[in-house]
């Protein structure tokens, strides 16, 4: 027969179990947030290598011969850029999945939409390396390209490099769109600061503006790029918060901890 003393302890036991469960859930949440943050950080390291460093180092504007000469002289660097795009595509897929795991408890529909839009980056990166591979083959020449004179090969290589850039402009559409559901999830999550979500929304609009100017109004691309830069720091702020701060306690978990 259960004693009266045992019955009076039941609420205390329930509170202890609830408290422990809350702490375990928070630990899991912090772990998942930091994992996603570290993957995102890896993406911010690999992506700029081909996107920014290679063009600024090897490409000479409106000079296919000089560009081809630079690629020949720094073939390993260019090949690393190709591999960097492949690696970025893989990391992008891992990031999308990790963020889905983190936010599916907030809103599964929004998390699924974020996953689908974020997933589109991976095939775009993989398809885009074909443009760089074609440019490299044209620069190197060989028996199969003997029908083309060197200036023709250099011009074709420049064309494929331009196509690579156009593909990036198209990809910015998805870079922007996937940030919108992610931003809403951050705002609703209660374990990340809301200002990060609002900044990500602005970041998404910045990418869309870059996409429109890159495809429709290329003459204004440099101007829009400079204006959009502060907004694009939203992703970096999100990454640093996830890595350094992780996830903060939900209001209900914090209340449970205080009550315990």
Where are these predicted regions, by residue range?
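Hydrophobic, aromatic-enriched alpha-helical segments typical of multi-pass transmembrane helices
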Residues: 6, 12-260
């Amino acid at each position: 027969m259960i004693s009266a003393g045992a019955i009076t302890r039941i609420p205390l036991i329930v509170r202890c179990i609830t408290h422990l469960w809350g702490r375990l859930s928070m630990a899991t949440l912090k772990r998942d947030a930091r994992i996603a943050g570290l993957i995102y950080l890896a993406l911010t390291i690999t992506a700029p290598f081909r996107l920014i460093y290679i063009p600024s180092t090897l490409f000479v504007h409106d000079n296919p011969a000089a560009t081809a000469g630079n690629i020949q002289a720094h073939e390993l660097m260019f090949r690393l850029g190709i591999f960097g795009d492949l690696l970025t595509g893989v990391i992008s897929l891992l990031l999308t999945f990790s963020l889905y795991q983190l936010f599916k408890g907030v809103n599964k529909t929004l998390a699924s939409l974020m996953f689908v839009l974020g997933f589109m980056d991976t095939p775009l990166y993989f398809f885009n390396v074909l443009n760089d591979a074609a440019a490299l083959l044209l620069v190197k020449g060989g028996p199969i390209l003997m029908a083309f004179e060197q200036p023709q090969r250099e011009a074709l290589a420049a064309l494929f490099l331009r196509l690579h850039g156009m593909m990036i402009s198209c990809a910015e559409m998805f870079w922007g769109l996937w940030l919108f559901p992610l931003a809403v999830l951050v705002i609703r999550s209660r374990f990340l600061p809301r200002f990060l979500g609002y900044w990500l929304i602005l970041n998404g609009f910045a990418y869309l503006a870059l996409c429109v100017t890159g495809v429709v109004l290329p003459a204004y691309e440099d101007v829009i790029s400079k204006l959009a830069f502060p907004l694009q720091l939203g992703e970096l702020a999100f990454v640093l918060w996830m890595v350094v701060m992780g996830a903060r306690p939900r209001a209900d978990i914090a209340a449970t901890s205080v009550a315990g």
